[in-house]
Amino acid sequence: MHVKTGDEVLIITGKDRGKRGKIKESRPKEQRVIVEGLNIVKRHMKPRGPTRPGGIIEMEAPIHVSNVMLICPKCGRASRTGHRFLEETDHKGRPKKVRYCKACDAVIDE
């Protein structure tokens, strides 16, 4: 996936189009992310004992990763990302793979 937990993203489609938020949770197997405070849905929950009462609860629903765009921390614009290998190596001796902003060519992962 082109985004990770903690990244700031822009929603590009749907009811929250144009809003920004931080990724709270990522689900790589489902290709979905949960963005803080966005894509709010109402769930009708059944009571689950004295500690969890029932009722209508608002919660954040997952969004497909194709509907979000990473906001570059360097230039502040929503842009596409790419991957490249650095000269330095990781702990296993392989070249380090990092994401970069295609708009300003800055490395996102340090």
Curated annotation (Swiss-Prot):
SUPFAM superfamilies referenced in this protein's UniProt entry, alphabetically: Translation proteins SH3-like domain
Keyword set includes Amino-acid biosynthesis: no
Keywords, in A-Z order: Ribonucleoprotein, Ribosomal protein, RNA-binding, rRNA-binding
InterPro entries: KOW, Rib_uL2_dom2, Ribosomal_uL24, Ribosomal_uL24_CS, Ribosomal_uL24_KOW, Translation_prot_SH3-like_sf
Entry's Gene Ontology molecular function annotations: rRNA binding; structural constituent of ribosome
Database matches in Pfam families: KOW (PF00467), ribosomal_L24 (PF17136)
GO cellular component, one term: ribonucleoprotein complex
GO biological process: translation
Record family assignment: Belongs to the universal ribosomal protein uL24 family.
PANTHER family: MITOCHONDRIAL RIBOSOMAL PROTEIN L24 (PTHR12903)
Oligomeric form and interacting partners: Part of the 50S ribosomal subunit.
Free-text function comment from the UniProt entry: One of two assembly initiator proteins, it binds directly to the 5'-end of the 23S rRNA, where it nucleates assembly of the 50S subunit.
HAMAP family in the cross-refs: Ribosomal_uL24_B (MF_01326_B)
Record's protein name: Large ribosomal subunit protein uL24
Gene symbol of the encoding locus: rplX
